[in-house]
């Protein structure tokens, strides 16, 4: 399944919830009304896009002719840009789900994170890549981690000593990030366990 846009995810979630609550899918008019579209035609365009992405089937000739091709999302969630102060896996950060077997990675991956920037390029982690992440706080010095400093999320190599943490880039053009644990909020969100080159798995 290709990643859904935020708006497509809203439409998909609405359909799934409506079926769960009423036993039948919503009409185009109901979708338009609930999501603030100007007309049922706008809802129809989103339905066609979802059909092209393989998450639902449009049954012609019926006002409620929508059939979900998967009852619930499976695969690994892809986390895009993370808003300040919010959980990494908050629903609004999830761009879609990818059919990737978590057990391909050791330890197994719990989610994918879209990489932003080139600070880790020397070990093959490029801008736009999908980083497979095992959700854990049990990490060791020298491992590549997903860390949150105050409200910023970053991918770096960990070096911790006492109350000081250094987050080391793998690109000579970048300088390490130094964190004083007595003054700054610092959380390990997970351990990097693999990379999917941008576009290869889509």
UniProtKB/Swiss-Prot annotation:
<dbReference type="GO" id="GO:0006281">
    <property type="term" value="P:DNA repair"/>
</dbReference>
<keyword id="KW-0378">Hydrolase</keyword>
<feature type="site" description="Cleavage; by autolysis">
    <location>
        <begin position="84"/>
        <end position="85"/>
    </location>
</feature>
<dbReference type="InterPro" id="IPR006200">
    <property type="entry name" value="LexA"/>
</dbReference>
<keyword id="KW-0804">Transcription</keyword>
<dbReference type="GO" id="GO:0009432">
    <property type="term" value="P:SOS response"/>
</dbReference>
<keyword id="KW-0068">Autocatalytic cleavage</keyword>
<dbReference type="InterPro" id="IPR036286">
    <property type="entry name" value="LexA/Signal_pep-like_sf"/>
</dbReference>
<dbReference type="Pfam" id="PF01726">
    <property type="entry name" value="LexA_DNA_bind"/>
</dbReference>
<keyword id="KW-0234">DNA repair</keyword>
<dbReference type="InterPro" id="IPR006197">
    <property type="entry name" value="Peptidase_S24_LexA"/>
</dbReference>
<keyword id="KW-0678">Repressor</keyword>
<feature type="DNA-binding region" description="H-T-H motif">
    <location>
        <begin position="28"/>
        <end position="48"/>
    </location>
</feature>
<dbReference type="GO" id="GO:0004252">
    <property type="term" value="F:serine-type endopeptidase activity"/>
</dbReference>
<keyword id="KW-0805">Transcription regulation</keyword>
<keyword id="KW-0238">DNA-binding</keyword>
<dbReference type="GO" id="GO:0032993">
    <property type="term" value="C:protein-DNA complex"/>
</dbReference>
<dbReference type="InterPro" id="IPR015927">
    <property type="entry name" value="Peptidase_S24_S26A/B/C"/>
</dbReference>
<dbReference type="GO" id="GO:0043565">
    <property type="term" value="F:sequence-specific DNA binding"/>
</dbReference>
<keyword id="KW-0227">DNA damage</keyword>
<dbReference type="GO" id="GO:0045892">
    <property type="term" value="P:negative regulation of DNA-templated transcription"/>
</dbReference>
<dbReference type="GO" id="GO:0001217">
    <property type="term" value="F:DNA-binding transcription repressor activity"/>
</dbReference>
<dbReference type="InterPro" id="IPR050077">
    <property type="entry name" value="LexA_repressor"/>
</dbReference>
<comment type="subunit">
    <text>Homodimer.</text>
</comment>
<keyword id="KW-0742">SOS response</keyword>
<dbReference type="InterPro" id="IPR036388">
    <property type="entry name" value="WH-like_DNA-bd_sf"/>
</dbReference>
<protein>
    <recommendedName>
        <fullName>LexA repressor</fullName>
        <ecNumber>3.4.21.88</ecNumber>
    </recommendedName>
</protein>
<dbReference type="GO" id="GO:0006508">
    <property type="term" value="P:proteolysis"/>
</dbReference>
<comment type="function">
    <text>Represses a number of genes involved in the response to DNA damage (SOS response), including recA and lexA. Binds to the 16 bp palindromic sequence 5'-CTGTATATATATACAG-3'. In the presence of single-stranded DNA, RecA interacts with LexA causing an autocatalytic cleavage which disrupts the DNA-binding part of LexA, leading to derepression of the SOS regulon and eventually DNA repair.</text>
</comment>
<feature type="active site" description="For autocatalytic cleavage activity">
    <location>
        <position position="156"/>
    </location>
</feature>
<keyword id="KW-0235">DNA replication</keyword>
<dbReference type="GO" id="GO:0006260">
    <property type="term" value="P:DNA replication"/>
</dbReference>
<dbReference type="InterPro" id="IPR039418">
    <property type="entry name" value="LexA-like"/>
</dbReference>
<dbReference type="InterPro" id="IPR006199">
    <property type="entry name" value="LexA_DNA-bd_dom"/>
</dbReference>
<dbReference type="Pfam" id="PF00717">
    <property type="entry name" value="Peptidase_S24"/>
</dbReference>
<comment type="similarity">
    <text>Belongs to the peptidase S24 family.</text>
</comment>
<feature type="active site" description="For autocatalytic cleavage activity">
    <location>
        <position position="119"/>
    </location>
</feature>
<dbReference type="InterPro" id="IPR036390">
    <property type="entry name" value="WH_DNA-bd_sf"/>
</dbReference>
């Amino acid at each position: 399944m290709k990643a859904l846009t935020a708006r497509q995810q809203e439409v998909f979630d609405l359909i799934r919830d409506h079926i769960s609550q009423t036993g039948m899918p919503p009409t185009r008019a109901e979708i338009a009304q609930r999501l603030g579209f100007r007309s049922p035609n706008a809802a129809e365009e989103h339905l066609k896009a979802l059909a092209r992405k393989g998450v639902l089937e449009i049954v012609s000739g019926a006002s409620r002719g929508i059939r979900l091709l998967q009852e619930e999302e499976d695969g690994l969630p892809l986390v895009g840009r993370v808003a300040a102060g919010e959980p990494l896996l908050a629903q609004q950060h999830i761009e879609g789900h990818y059919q990737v077997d978590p057990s391909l990675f050791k330890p197994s991956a719990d989610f994918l994170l879209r990489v932003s920037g080139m600070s880790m390029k020397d070990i093959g982690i490029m801008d736009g890549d999908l980083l497979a992440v095992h959700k854990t706080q049990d990490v060791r010095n020298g491992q590549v981690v997903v860390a949150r400093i105050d409200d910023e999320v970053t991918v770096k190599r960990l070096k911790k000593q006492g109350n000081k943490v250094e987050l080391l880039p793998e690109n000579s053009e970048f300088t390490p990030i130094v964190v004083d644990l007595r003054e700054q909020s610092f959380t390990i969100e997970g351990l990097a366990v693999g990379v999917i080159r941008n576009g290869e798995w889509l």
